[in-house]
Amino acid sequence: MNQADPRLRAVCLWTLTSAAMSRGDNCTDLLALGIPSITQAWGLWVLLGAVTLLFLISLAAHLSQWTRGRSRSHPGQGRSGESVEEVPLYGNLHYLQTGRLSQDPEPDQQDPTLGGPARAAEEVMCYTSLQLRPPQGRIPGPGTPVKYSEVVLDSEPKSQASGPEPELYASVCAQTRRARASFPDQAYANSQPAAS
């Protein structure tokens, strides 16, 4: 018992010589090696308790929000109780943002980077309806292939004949028009004239 652990001796020596130990406390006030008791460092223990409490409250809030989100978007159910297969998906960004198919967005929902209503009137909206295959006695998995059905072109006459092509999502018609404009005398855009 005469031989004490050198690390414990160093900790006790440091603790005794520190300013916190000038009150006459001894090494028995340590909970473990290097961890002060509540009476020595009550401020640190209060801070640790507050941080732990905030962490637990945050964890509970996130878990409740996550479970609420999962119950709303139950797999196989749409917004109004319909199955996912009955709700068509559109590749048009404006439709995804507003839920409406109108050409002119409301003034409070306009994106200032798009150029306002003048550009919105010039754009050609081209979107596609993606329909999933109906389940045959089972819930479709994440690897179920998507059947591409129809492509609908909703266009208005443009004031400018040659302008930049609008940004379209899921658009086949715009690529076809570009290919015809680039190679009017060739059957395909990527075909090259034969070398003679």
From Swiss-Prot:
Protein name, entry field: Signaling threshold-regulating transmembrane adapter 1
Tissue occurrence: Specifically expressed in T- and B-cells. Present in plasma cells but not in germinal center B-cells (at protein level). Expressed in T- and B-cell lymphoma.
Species this protein is from:
Homo sapiens (Human)
Maturation and modification:
Phosphorylated on tyrosines by LCK, FYN or ZAP70 upon TCR activation; which leads to the recruitment of PTPN11, GRB2 and CSK.
Q: Which residues are annotated with the PTM Phosphotyrosine?
A: Y90, Y127, Y148, Y169, Y188
Membrane topology according to the record:
Single-pass type I membrane protein
Q: Which gene encodes it?
A: SIT1
Q: Where is this region: Interaction with CSK?
A: 169-172
Annotated region Disordered: the residues are: 132-167
**Keywords assigned:** Adaptive immunity, Cell membrane, Disulfide bond, Glycoprotein, Immunity, Membrane, Phosphoprotein, Signal, Transmembrane, Transmembrane helix
Single Gene Ontology BP annotation: adaptive immune response
Location of the protein in the cell: Cell membrane
Signal peptide per UniProt: 1-24
Q: Which residues lie on this side of the membrane: Cytoplasmic?
A: 62-196
Which intervals lie on the Extracellular side per UniProt? 25-40
User: What does this gene product do?
Assistant: Negatively regulates TCR (T-cell antigen receptor)-mediated signaling in T-cells. Involved in positive selection of T-cells.
Question: Impact of changing Y148F on the protein?
Answer: Reduces interaction with PTPN11, no effect on inhibition of NF-AT activation
State the source organism's domain of life: Eukaryota
Phosphoserine PTM positions read S80, S83, S102, S182
According to the UniProt entry, which residues carry Phosphothreonine?
Answer: T144
Region of interest (Interaction with GRB2), residue spans: 90-93, 188-191
- Listed PANTHER family: SIGNALING THRESHOLD-REGULATING TRANSMEMBRANE ADAPTER 1 (PTHR15604:SF0)
| Glycosylation site residues | N26
GO CC, sorted alphabetically, is: extracellular exosome; plasma membrane
Q: Does the keyword Metal-binding apply?
A: no
